[in-house]
Amino acid sequence: MYQRALLFSALATAVSAQQVGTQKAEVHPALTWQKCTAAGSCTDQKGSVVIDANWRWLHSTEDTTNCYTGNEWNAELCPDNEACAKNCALDGADYSGTYGVTADGSSLKLNFVTSANVGSRLYLMEDDETYQMFNLLNNEFTFDVDVSNLPCGLNGALYFVSMDADGGLSKYPGNKAGAKYGTGYCDSQCPRDLKFINGEANVEGWKPSDNDKNAGVGGYGSCCPEMDIWEANSISTAYTPHPCDGMEQTRCDGNDCGGTYSSTRYAGTCDPDGCDFNSFRMGNESFYGPGGLVDTKSPITVVTQFVTAGGTDSGALKEIRRVYVQGGKVIGNSASNVAGVEGDSITSDFCTAQKKAFGDEDIFSKHGGLEGMGKALNKMALIVSIWDDHASSMMWLDSTYPVDADASTPGVARGTCEHGLGDPETVESQHPDASVTFSNIKFGPIGSTYKSV
């Protein structure tokens, strides 16, 4: 993800640690998805989703006193990282009432604003205490999505990260909650907005955000490889691999984390930019959007294929392909119209040429490139989210970015949204009823999850 917003609800609390509360039972909304075979038969899998611990109520283990309110910690309960983990408990979630999350069969709808809550991030579960893990190599991942109610500045995302399957429960003694309560998050931005990392609080060095009343940045970050299958609204979309030097979740320290949350963007062990394929940015301005060849006024089937050398589940990743299906018609991905950049998929050659054409620093190759991304794809957790962007107003996805750059310069124009339309204050006040719906998730060998004719 090129920029990761400081994602918090007014009830935002803690990630990857602390105790479990008893005020409300945790019941994961059921979500059915399908696993397919090479022969094309697909069988239902009875899964569920869990909301990230960062959205949950965090309170004293002794009573209902908040451990975190607004964007500040309770100094008495959280004087330091270790004490905070011992003193504070996560509690169960009211998915629809508090967070605007509703599941029905194979469909999952995420509302943007529900009362005081803004956005959400959820993980697919294999069972009540384990995230569903996927080996994407030599396979394809397919889902339907409705982005018609996602205006400028919003992002209805579906992506994979190399989280621990149990949310870090077995690794870190301070973590008593685990995947059941949505702990253990990490991504390629090495986010420092997480309240708990590796079983300890992130209170030491915490600085409340200047532009988000519910957010802040702590002394630690949480890093891991990230494969963005879908970052999109009704205007623009991108898919983006983000490799890291390590293949698993690791904790980083301060500005050495790099990414959105640190003073030096490229200081860390991950690639915060990635190698993105945004059709608009690649010169095809009519391919995706309202009334486009891929028309965002109607639901879209999105197919992403991970092609390996030798066509094996353990082969080196050599290409990430994209196919769309809409109205019964298969639509191949748009081809690059940028001079010096060829192709309609993500390959090593595409990424190298794109970085050169756009004048972007090639951090992607520095951290392993496509082959490095492939090494992480054999065990990844699935995430869906809806969010706005307090760092750059989602302009990197749907507008011209950087702000002061000439829109005619290759790579600057990413969508048709005017500057200012995506500001969080604007989207939260003008589009609180925005939403995204994901449905009909399918996973299997390449060619097994959709009909090609």
From Swiss-Prot:
A single MF term (Gene Ontology): cellulose 1,4-beta-cellobiosidase activity
Record-listed E.C. numbers: 3.2.1.91
Record-level GO cellular component terms: extracellular region
UniProt similarity note: Belongs to the glycosyl hydrolase 7 (cellulase C) family.
Keywords noted in UniProt: Carbohydrate metabolism, Cellulose degradation, Glycoprotein, Glycosidase, Hydrolase, Polysaccharide degradation, Secreted, Signal
TM ranges: none
The UniProt record lists the keyword Hydrolase: yes
Active-site annotation: 226, 231
Main location class: secreted
Class of enzymatic activity (EC top level): hydrolase
InterPro entries from the UniProt entry: ConA-like_dom_sf (IPR013320), Glyco_hydro_7 (IPR001722), Glyco_hydro_7_sf (IPR037019)
Recorded catalytic activity of this chain's protein: Hydrolysis of (1->4)-beta-D-glucosidic linkages in cellulose and cellotetraose, releasing cellobiose from the non-reducing ends of the chains
GO annotation, biological process: cellulose catabolic process
Glycosylation site residues: 284
SUPFAM superfamilies linked to this entry: Concanavalin A-like lectins/glucanases
Protein task: The biological conversion of cellulose to glucose generally requires three types of hydrolytic enzymes: (1) Endoglucanases which cut internal beta-1,4-glucosidic bonds; (2) Exocellobiohydrolases that cut the disaccharide cellobiose from the non-reducing end of the cellulose polymer chain; (3) Beta-1,4-glucosidases which hydrolyze the cellobiose and other short cello-oligosaccharides to glucose.
Domain of life: Eukaryota
Compartmental location: Secreted
CDD domains, per the entry: GH7_CBH_EG (cd07999)
Organism the protein comes from: Aspergillus clavatus (strain ATCC 1007 / CBS 513.65 / DSM 816 / NCTC 3887 / NRRL 1 / QM 1276 / 107)
Leader sequence residues: 1-17
Protein name: Probable 1,4-beta-D-glucan cellobiohydrolase A
Pfam families: Glyco_hydro_7
